[in-house]
Amino acid sequence: MFPQIWGVIFLFTPTVFSELFKDPELLAGFYQGDIKAHPIRTRNGIVNQIYHWPNRTVPYMIEDDAFADSHYREILRAISIIEENSCVIFKPATEMDFPMALVITSKGLGCNTVHLGYRNKTQVVNLEIYPLGEGCFRIGSIIHELLHVLGFEHQHVSQNRDQYVSIQWKNINPQYNINFVNNDNSTAWHDFDEGYDYESVMHYVPRAFSRNGQPTIVPLREGAENMGQRFYMSEKDIRKLNKMYRCPDHV
């Protein structure tokens, strides 16, 4: 029997959520699955501009021999999607840019990011090799990690999440409870007046960190058909990014 919530049947097929209970964004054992350094408690997007990339520009380097040509091109496609929908620019890093640059590698387990936002030090994104369209090489998973780099946290821990989702603590593996603690009254981060977004590419899948195969995140309102999708930036993702980086022609 498929879980049915608000008249929506969630069909967790391999083409939608490959390896549902082995999602590579959750595998590495870091904070919230894919953030190595425990961040400031957040709402969803960072407000303080010291954590925004200077001049809206991210110098990046894709490690030599880390990826096949097809995977390299998919990373560039994800970068292009962000650039086309905002004023943020990713530019190949030079020696002058280091150590304040982004390094994209495939040496570790899963898909993960060292820090949220700009931290005046080298930022690293790991994308474990999977076939294109699966695991870390779902286009939305690459975008997800790049949005962490730009300053986004996961949607399900936003300050107002309890109005939109019910966290099923009984179904969560207890060692991962910290990954579901929300941001309470943090003022360091903001939703940029866009509100909660079930469709965000930053939202967990409904059964993230489940101990028993049952949902850990249950939507309380309609419109959650695509919760946890990894295919595209949602309209709210795009608007939040543009507001965060004060993009004059995109807000």
From Swiss-Prot:
Subcellular location: Secreted
Cysteine disulfide links: C87-C247, C111-C136
Main enzyme class: hydrolase
Consequence of changing R41A: Incomplete processing of Acp26Aa and Semp1 in mated females
Expressed in which tissues: Produced in the male accessory glands and secreted into seminal fluid. In mated females, confined to the reproductive tract and also detected in eggs laid by mated females (at protein level).
Catalytic residue positions: E145
InterPro entries associated with the record: Astacin-like_dom, MetalloPept_cat_dom_sf, Peptidase_M12A, Peptidase_Metallo
Effect of disrupting the coding gene: Loss of cleavage of accessory gland proteins Acp26Aa and Acp36DE in females mated with mutant males. RNAi-mediated knockdown in males results in incomplete and delayed processing of Acp26Aa and Acp36DE in females mated with these males.
Annotated residues for binding of Zn(2+): H144, H148, H154
GO molecular function, one term: endopeptidase activity
Name of the protein this chain belongs to: Seminal metalloprotease 1
Organism field: Drosophila melanogaster
Gene designation per UniProt: Semp1
